Amino acid sequence: MLFRFRAQQAADLGIIDIGRTRRPKAITSVDSIPSCEKWRGQVLKEISRKVSRIQEPSLSDYQIRDLNDEINKLMREKWAWEMQIRNLGGPNYMRGSGRVYDDEGREIPGGGKGYRYFGRARELPGVKEMFEAAARRGRRPPEEEEEEEGKGRGGDIATKKVDANYFGYGLDEEDGSLLAYERQKEKEAVEYLRGQKDSDAEDGWEPLPGDAGDGVEWRLPTLEEVQEELVDRRRRRLLDKIS
């Protein structure tokens, strides 16, 4: 507490710039690559320190969970700093494998993408069983599978051999076959909905104008009508509470 008081006192007197000693929250506001490198290195030191501490046998399960959450939060912050460094034209630390190294070049186990479990967090109740079940099935841990699935969902689209059809710019509408198929399916869906019994509708539901065969076109309500409806609903709720 005394150190913080003295630091704040020095900042008020203009002796030190407290903005240089406190890590910025708005990472995208930092437009200097050396500054980003500095803060990234600080985050890596914190990660390395917490990964070492989570191995201690004296920690309770609650402390281990909190530490593991803090490490994952720092991992996300590290990724944000690396994104900012890359956007500013600096080195791309995200290129290559998902391995993570501290500021001294030592690999941090479990430091890939997604939520990870470090040290004794892998022995927590529920987590340990999850890893054992994955080992019995001969599969990788769930966290690694999630990372692999993320790549398969289009994360590596730049390396795939795709053409304009993949993005919906094909020529399948020029001959009219696709449009005819869509019209047929739309007609079948409308006939199916019309064939449904009225009793299937929930209480309080009303058909939209035009859907009930009254020939009235559906229109968006005005702002005044919406406000009037909301006021009316609130008034009804208040009356129900009073009664």
Curated annotation (Swiss-Prot):
Keyword Isomerase: no
Alphabetized UniProt keyword annotations: Cytoplasm, mRNA processing, mRNA splicing, Nucleus, Spliceosome
InterPro entries in the cross-refs: Helix_hairpin_bin_sf, Isy1, Isy1_sf
Region (Disordered), start-end ranges: 133-157, 191-216
Primary location: cytoplasm
One cellular component (GO) term of this entry: post-spliceosomal complex
Pfam families to which the protein is assigned, alphabetical: Isy1 (PF06246)
One GO term (biological process): mRNA 3'-splice site recognition
Subcellular location: Cytoplasm; Nucleus
Keyword Cytoplasm assigned: yes
Family: Belongs to the ISY1 family.
Complex and partners: Associated with the spliceosome.
PANTHER family given in the database record: PRE-MRNA-SPLICING FACTOR ISY1
Functional summary from the UniProt entry: Involved in pre-mRNA splicing.
Name of the featured protein: Pre-mRNA-splicing factor isy1
Gene: isy1
